[in-house]
Amino acid sequence: MSAKKAFKAFSKFSKQEKIELLENIINVYKKRMPELASAITTEMGAPITLSTKAQVPSGLGHFIQAKKTLENYNFEKEINSSLVIKEPVGVCGLITPWNWPLNQISCKVAPALAAGCTMVLKPSEIAPLSAIVFSDILKL
C-alpha cells in the first residue's frame, strides 16, 4: 500500500491508537536491539560496543520520547474565540545519512507516527542494513 493511500486511514488514528502503536514498536525494538547493533556494526564498521551502547539506544530514545510527548499533547486548543486544531500534514519524505543511521531514522519516523503522518523513507545506500531491520520491526 502506498504512503498516500495509507495516510487516509492512519491520519484518523486516535491519540490512544498512536500511543499503542508506539508502545508496540518500542517493545519489538527492545527485543531486536542485538540484531540492530549487529547490522550497524556490519554496515558502517562501528565497534559492537558503540553500536550496542550508543547507536541502538539512541534510536529507541526517540520512540520513548515521542510516546511521552504524545501522551501529554493537545491537538486542539482554544485561543480567544477560535479553536486551533493540529492535524497530520500528509506523507513525509525522509532522507537519512549513513552516519548514526538508526538514530537519524528514528528521530524522523517516531514524531511522524506520533503526529499521524505516513512516510517514505530513503535510507543511505551506503548503510541500509539497519533500515532493513528497522522496517521489519514496523511490520508488527
PLM region spans:
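N-terminal Rossmann-like NAD(P)+-binding subdomain of aldehyde/semialdehyde dehydrogenases
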Residues: 1-80
